[in-house]
Amino acid sequence: MRNMTLEHIAAVCGGTYIGNEADKKREIMGAVIDSRLVEKDYLFIPVRGEKVDGHSFISSVFEKGALAVLSEEQLENPAGPYILVKSSLDAMKKLAADYRRSLDIKVVGITGSVGKTSTKEMIASVLAQKYNVLKTEGNLNNEIGLPLTIFKIREEHQVSVLEMGISEFGEMDRLATMAYPDICVITNIGLCHLENLITRDGILKAKTESFAHLTPDGIAVLNGDDDKLCEKKIVNGKPAVFYGIGKEAKTAETEEGTKTLAEKVIYATDVEAVGLTGTKAVIHYPDKKTGEEVTMEVEIPIAGEHNVYNALAAVSVARELGLTCEEMKRGIESVQTIGGRSNLIHKNGVTIIDDCYNANPVSMKASIDVLSKAPGRKIAVLGDMGELGAEEKQLHRMVGAHFAGKGIDILYCAGTLSKEIAEAVQECSSETKVHYYGEKAALIQDLLKEAKSGDTILVKASHFMGFPEIVKELTK
C-alpha cells in the first residue's frame, strides 16, 4: 500500500502515533480486521463487535508480523507501534477514503434495491476482458466490508468494481465517501429495506446520496425503465446514461398518473429465454467516438430477463471505459453465477434453482418467472422476505398474486409471512397444490418425498430464513 506510512495513517485517522520514531516512515503492506489474516507488515484494525472485541487479539498479531495496530485504548508494553484513535471503525473508514484517493484507478460503484451482486459480477466479467479488475467479494458491501475491499487494491489493478449496500439514510453517504466512484450504477429502486427507508421515494433519496461523491468527471449509469430513476436525467451537471429493454421510452402507471420513462442510450431488443440455461438478446449502443449504432447479439448464460438488465449495465460501463464490442460480448457470455443467486444445480435428475441468498418482492417475482419457463414439473419453495416494514403482509400477498397463473405445479411455503403468499395463491389459482409449514423440518421431509426426476425446484427466501439447508438436503 504505497505511501501508507504509519505517520501518514496517524494523521489521516486523527490519531496519536505511539512507538519507535524510526518506524513512522515504514509503509504497511495491507490492512485487516481479522487477526487470522494478518501477514508481515500488515496493519491490524481491532473492531468491537457484539460478541468479540478485536482488541483482545492485539498481542497475537505482533507475533504474526504485524507492523502496527490501531487501538481505542492505551496499550501496556506493546510488542510494536500503535496508533491511538477514538474509534477504530471511524479510523478505518477515513483511511480507506484516503487510500482510494491516492490510487490511479477507475472505480465503478454499484448500488440498487435488487441485482447489485449479479450486476457487479457481470460488470467485472466484462471489464476483465481488457483490464486488471478487483471486485467486491461475497457480501463485503457495507461500512466494514467496503474499506476492507479498498485496502486490497494494488498498483497492478486498473479498475475496481465496488458494491455498496445500505438499509438506512446516511449510509450511502459514508460508503460513497470511501468509494469515490468514477461511475455510479444504480440498478433499480425496489421494495426493500422499508423498515428504515419507508417508501420508494425514501429509497431513491438514500441510494442517490452517492451522486455527491462522484469524481469531478464522474457519471451516473441508471436503469431507464425504472419509474424513479428516470427522474434523474442530469447528475452533477452531466446527462445520466440510461439503459433498458426496448428502444422507445416506456410508460408506467404511478400515483401521479401515466408517466413516460427515460430515453435510453443503451437498450436491448429481441429478448428470448433459452430454457433455464440462458437468455438471448440483441444489445444496441452508440459508439463512444463516432456515435454510430453498434448492434451486438449475446447469449447470457443465466436465465431471466433481469439478467439482460445486468448485461446492459455492463455495456454502459464498458462503453465509457473504452472496451470493444468483442470484449463486451466475451465478458457477458462468460459470466459465472455464484452460490445462492440463480445458481443451477443438477442432482438425481432434479434441477434446483438455488436463489436463497436473499429475497424481496422484485427478485421473488423474477425468480418465479424463471421457474415458469422450466420444462417438466415445476415446484417452488418460498420463504419470508425481510425488512419490508408496515406493508410486509400486503407485499407477500402481492407475490402470491403474481405466482398464480404461472403454471407452477406445487408450492411449498415456510415462515410466518410466507403464509400470506400461500393464501393468495390459493385464492387466485386452482392449478397449484399449496402446502404451508410453520417450520422447515416438516417441509424438507415432505419435499424430499415429493421430488422426482424431471422436476425443477426453485428455492428462494431472505437469508435469515436459512433456506440453504433445504438446498443442502436436496443435493445430498
Regions found by a protein language model. Name each.
Residues 22-25, 153-156, 166-194, 230-295, ...:
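Extended acidic/charged loop-beta regions that coordinate divalent cations
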